[in-house]
């Protein structure tokens, strides 16, 4: 096991490896710390834990302090989020532009993955606030923010071969040409899929791009679908042992935000065991504590230092190559698994 102490007021990071009995020793300065532990076995099982706020103050003396972390268990995924471009860019005449967002999924295994029936969604809430779900619930179920999107297909219509990827755009058009002319943007007219539905009047898609199914929309006033530029938490999941329609239409699978004043606003709740992969993003370093999901889904959020509308993307690190097929790093820790880069679709 590897442990990390990070001083919150200065950003100083201390690292150490655990002994055979799971003990890591640190000699650190007084301050306020975030403590994290992570281990990945050869079989692909991941153990991780995190303590958000640990105070080490002079009045506590210089005696050794013992800190115990509860570990969460997870596993490496076959289907991973390879890239997520959400911050937007500076559009024509320097205006903020975010209609060009997309996410890319990748088959990180040596077996064919079928997309049929799998779902994509954002996790509630946006990262600017402390999650009431994390604060007040056990997080055994993950709240979906408004819309749940699903790949069509009856089971084996949409294969994704080992080392293959597929991209889904919020607006599947060429944002650099035609009526758009945003030179800093990307051409999304040739992607595979689009987040598009006839009820969303501001979504755009070109012929040849397949629309996902809008499985459920719990925001009847929405006229578009976009990722928050301040950092989305994006997840892939699949239904197990029940049809998608039966599950989403059961009122027992919808909840209010804990402690919320609005009792008419509901969110679809997904068992955390159904989540295949998750990318947890926040706006900046100051928001890293605003987690949306438990550690077994993602250990630490990631952010783009250049900020909103910077034209930057988050791309998963390549860990190895086998017979010409890239294998991407997947430790369920977005802060370690992704790097900031220009969008892969940017010419």
Give names to the regions the model predicted.
Residues 28-44:
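A short, solvent-exposed beta-strand micro-motif common in secreted/extracellular proteins
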Residues 12, 41-66, 70:
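Structured interaction patches on ligand/partner-binding surfaces of diverse proteins
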């Amino acid at each position: 096991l590897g442990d990390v102490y990070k001083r919150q007021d200065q950003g100083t990071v201390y690292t150490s490896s655990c002994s055979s009995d799971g003990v890591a020793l640190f000699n650190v300065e007084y301050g306020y710390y975030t403590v994290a532990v992570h281990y990945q076995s050869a079989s692909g099982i991941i153990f991780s834990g995190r303590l958000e706020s640990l105070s080490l103050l002079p009045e506590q003396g210089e005696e050794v302090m013992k800190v115990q972390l509860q570990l969460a268990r997870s596993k490496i995924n076959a289907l991973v989020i390879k890239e997520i471009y959400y911050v937007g860019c500076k559009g024509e005449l320097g205006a903020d532009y975010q209609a060009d967002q997309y996410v890319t999924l990748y088959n990180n295994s040596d077996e064919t993955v079928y997309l049929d029936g799998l779902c994509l969604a954002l996790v509630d809430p946006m990262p600017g606030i402390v999650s009431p779900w994390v604060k007040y619930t056990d997080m055994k179920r993950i709240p979906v923010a408004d819309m749940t999107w699903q790949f069509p297909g009856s089971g084996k219509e949409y294969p994704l071969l080992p080392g293959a990827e597929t991209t889904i755009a919020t607006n599947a058009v060429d944002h650099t040409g035609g009526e758009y002319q945003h030179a800093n943007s990307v051409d999304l007219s040739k992607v595979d899929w689009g987040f598009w539905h006839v009820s969303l009047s501001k979504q755009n898609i070109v012929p040849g791009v397949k629309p996902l199914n809008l499985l459920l929309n719990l925001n009847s006033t929405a006229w578009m679908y976009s990722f928050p530029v301040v950092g989305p938490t994006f997840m892939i999941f699949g239904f197990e042992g029940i049809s998608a329609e039966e599950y989403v239409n059961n009122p027992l699978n919808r909840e209010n935000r804990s402690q919320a004043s609005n009792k008419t606003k509901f969110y679809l709740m997904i068992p955390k065991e159904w989540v295949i992969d998750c990318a947890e993003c926040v706006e900046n370093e100051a928001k890293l504590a605003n987690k949306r999901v438990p550690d077994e889904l993602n250990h630490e959020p990631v952010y783009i230092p250049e900020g909103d509308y910077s034209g930057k993307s988050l791309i998963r690190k390549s860990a190895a190559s086998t017979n010409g097929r890239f294998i991407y790093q997947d430790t369920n820790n977005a802060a370690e698994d992704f790097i900031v880069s220009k969008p892969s679709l940017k010419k």
